């Protein structure tokens, strides 16, 4: 009995759902998917092209931070010497 009910429910659901979607809507959604895939591909190319610039900027920022940290360290040493004298 459960099997017959399950099969009947599946057949009924299939019949009902097949009438809910028209071909125009499916084609529009397929077109939207293609457009989005093209945009994703362009963005991936842009990211790949920018990656070397990002690494260069990070490297320069790290060098600048290292110089500033060293400068702060020596400034602190000078201050300590002044107060120690």
Swiss-Prot record:
GO terms for cellular component: cell outer membrane. The gene is yqhH. A lipid is attached at residue 20 (N-palmitoyl cysteine). It comes from the Bacteria. A lipid is attached at residue 20 (S-diacylglycerol cysteine). InterPro entries: Lipoprotein_leucine-zipper_dom, MOM_Lpp. SUPFAM superfamilies: Outer membrane lipoprotein. This is Uncharacterized lipoprotein YqhH. It is a lipid-anchor; Peptidoglycan-anchor. It is found in: Cell outer membrane. The keyword Oxidoreductase does not apply. It comes from Escherichia coli (strain K12). PANTHER family: MAJOR OUTER MEMBRANE LIPOPROTEIN LPP, MAJOR OUTER MEMBRANE PROLIPOPROTEIN LPP. Its main location: membrane.
């Amino acid at each position: 009995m459960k099997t017959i009910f399950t099969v009947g429910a599946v057949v009924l659901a299939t019949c009902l759902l097949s009438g809910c979607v028209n071909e125009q809507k499916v084609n529009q959604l397929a077109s939207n998917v293609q457009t989005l895939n093209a945009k994703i591909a362009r963005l991936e190319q842009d990211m790949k092209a920018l990656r070397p610039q990002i690494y260069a900027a990070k490297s320069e920022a790290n060098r600048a931070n290292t110089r500033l940290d060293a400068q702060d360290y020596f400034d602190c040493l000078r201050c300590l010497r002044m107060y120690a004298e």
